[in-house]
Amino acid sequence: MKVAIIGATGYSGAELFRLLQAHPHVDRCDVYLSSQDGVHLSESFPHVGAVDGAVLHKLDIEALAKYDAVFFATPPGVSGEWAPALVDRGVKVIDLSGDFRLKDGAVYERWYGREAAPAAYLKRAVYGLTEWNRDAVREAELLSNPGCYPTATLLGLAPLVKERLIEEDSIIVDAKSGVSGAGRKAGLGTHFSEVNENVKIYKVNAHQHIPEIEQMLGTWNGAMKPITFSTHLIPMTRGIMSTIYAKVKQPFSLNDLIDLYKTSYEDASFVRIRQPGQFPATKEVYGSNYCDIGLAYDERTGRVTVVSVIDNLMKGAAGQAVQNFNLMMGWDEVEGLCFLPTYP
């Protein structure tokens, strides 16, 4: 199996390269970039070392068409331009950017501030929230990998929304991410002195992941209303914690709630539900493809609290991309991902 990564000099691309280099079914993994040619990936990431196949190639559609699968770990706009031609040539495409996540091009243009991909390909793209879309992922030619915040938030909300247990207008999401979620490009906001010993809220009511979350919630329950969603940058490298609050329609016990989640995710190899009174921490999924979920119910307020944690570069990006890649190729979804988190 021959695969290529476009955009391997970013954090998600580098993590994807690490996973695919060790994947049992991948014989060759090449790397491409729009701006460099003939430079070894170790120039950007010394930890890669002198790995064969890690020399960057400039984008070339005919060269890319010879691969079995191509991964886009690129900024918005790149896959929207290049992916359609690869799909037309029979190449499986897994896109880690947001270019194909939103079905309505006008919504994409409003939230991303750029031209949307062709409507026909937005329609063909399969949203790769693996645990809730396996059958469609298996048949996908163009796979849109979910964003990091949506992955943590949607996995945390799915059982409640699908079973219609919460008020449709009551969802509040308080999400926090490590600095790698902001990408590798240098900027004042991610300088050490700006983020160290500091917590910052950003993109208040304006994060591009809001319509992605609402789109999926709406497919599960057509009566869903807009959510309140806030994001914070915290001084750590990896990890996302999505703390979710919602008003229940009728009282239930915490044990019943946990049983619902355990039943919902009984076939999910990478979702782990905590026992009553236990809540996950980001360090407990570090470097893994796991999503850990803790639950609480407040009888005084009639609100449920869901705490969902992931590694933003793994389950929130490269790990979930490989999980979807596995299904698209007809393999067990856990191939190349069966390892515990790194701790401490």
Swiss-Prot record:
Known pathway: Amino-acid biosynthesis; L-arginine biosynthesis; N(2)-acetyl-L-ornithine from L-glutamate: step 3/4
EC number: 1.2.1.38
GO MF annotation terms: N-acetyl-gamma-glutamyl-phosphate reductase activity; NAD binding; NADP+ binding
Entry annotation: catalytic residues: C148
InterPro entries named in the record: AGPR_AS (IPR023013), AGPR_type-1 (IPR000706), NAD(P)-bd_dom_sf (IPR036291), NAGSA_dehydrogenase (IPR050085), Semialdehyde_DH_NAD-bd (IPR000534)
Domain of life: Bacteria
Coiled-coil ranges from the UniProt annotation: none
Biological process (GO), any one: L-arginine biosynthetic process
A GO CC term assigned to this protein in UniProt: cytoplasm
UniProt keyword terms in alphabetical order: Amino-acid biosynthesis, Arginine biosynthesis, Cytoplasm, NADP, Oxidoreductase
Catalytic activity as recorded in UniProt: N-acetyl-L-glutamate 5-semialdehyde + phosphate + NADP(+) = N-acetyl-L-glutamyl 5-phosphate + NADPH + H(+)
SMART domains named among the record's database cross-references: Semialdhyde_dh
Locations listed in the record: Cytoplasm
Major location category of this protein: cytoplasm
Record function comment: Catalyzes the NADPH-dependent reduction of N-acetyl-5-glutamyl phosphate to yield N-acetyl-L-glutamate 5-semialdehyde.
Similarity comment: Belongs to the NAGSA dehydrogenase family. Type 1 subfamily.
Name of the featured protein: N-acetyl-gamma-glutamyl-phosphate reductase
Organism of this sequence: Geobacillus thermodenitrificans (strain NG80-2)
